[in-house]
């Protein structure tokens, strides 16, 4: 395996992650244009000499509508984003049941965090603990007032000081490199599009079962029941495609940040092998027993879901928030 220096890996992942993040608004606006174009195409055209209706796309009309609608969509998404962005810290704490950890309660953990912060030249984040026998840790927050490192009691019981320093160094690197802010941004964008997709699918379901598919004459008399259904189906397809691409983009962002956090954590604690050893122990029993939300699980140092084998490993790898633990350990052991 080709040797990749820690700083080189960090710079490379930063560039790639920045490009991936730009893709989110591009996907949203792109799918909106496709939706408008599809509606225009299926509702615009002319009859040929044989009397058949020929669909025709009026690109100028689509662009004009897009210019009128886009600002409203962007404004709505912006309001949604701001509300979700600034309420995420309380949501995460409530979902995980995390409680603040004070120095007098656990000086071992507090001192490790404090020493690593001094070594890295960064401010001390909050430290939370979750009473759970499983092994995991994660970083959260969007600014210095909300940055938090959370660990489980199972992690504290099973890891020695060097291994715990490696794990905490990993999480501090997420904070130092603003990964938590980046991941929260990606989670919110995916949540917005998934909500739109679910809403459109629900509207299609309601129309099918509560009056959307009457006879052909009924549809004509009512003035476009079928047209409305066609609009909803086109909307569902566009939202579904946008959801797929945003999910793939979000997962790619998360995987790259994990590699970078491993490299930064190893550099911060000065012992890559200790972090590799910690990952082996955590992989045997990862997760949080009372939390099943995938948007929170993607912040864990190891995701509790296992990758498949062979072809399924490739497919599941595309939809994985974390690279394989074995690959992460191999990279740490080469330093």
Segments from the language model and where they lie:
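Hydrophobic or amphipathic, alpha-helical segments that drive membrane association/targeting
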Residues: 1-134, 186-259, 269, 283-286, ...
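Soluble periplasmic/extracytoplasmic beta-strand elements of cell-envelope proteins
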Residues: 84, 128-129, 150, 166, ...
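Short pre-active-site segment immediately N-terminal to the catalytic Zn-binding motif
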Residues: 101, 153-166
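Helix N-cap/coil-helix junction residues
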Residues: 122, 177-178, 270, 334
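Catalytic Zn2+-binding segment of zinc metalloproteases
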Residues: 172-188, 273
